[in-house]
Amino acid sequence: MSRVCELSGTRANNGMAVSHSHIRTKKLQQANLQKRRLWWEEGKKWLNIRVSTSTLKTIQKKGLDSYAKSQGIDLKKL
């Protein structure tokens, strides 16, 4: 299973780790993904999905249905 948010598509970011002596090495910054069981009101069922915490905050603010519509996601396929 890949480390990708199922709703927003958030994935890892390539960054640099910089030491005190300014030696730079490549570093992978993973997305903060959580497994959550979210209630889908329109479909009247629970959805078990891997979602990033920033997406969870947006879902709490907007709601699952409106967020999925804004992203163009069909929740019936999840």
Curated annotation (Swiss-Prot):
Gene Ontology annotations of biological process type: translation
GO cellular component terms, alphabetically, are: ribonucleoprotein complex; ribosome
**Coiled-coil parts of chain:** none
What Pfam families does its record include? Ribosomal_L28
Its keywords, alphabetically, are: Ribonucleoprotein, Ribosomal protein
| GO-annotated molecular function | structural constituent of ribosome
Top-rank lineage group of the source organism: Bacteria
Family of this protein? Belongs to the bacterial ribosomal protein bL28 family.
Q: What HAMAP family does the annotation carry?
A: Ribosomal_bL28
* UniProt protein name: Large ribosomal subunit protein bL28
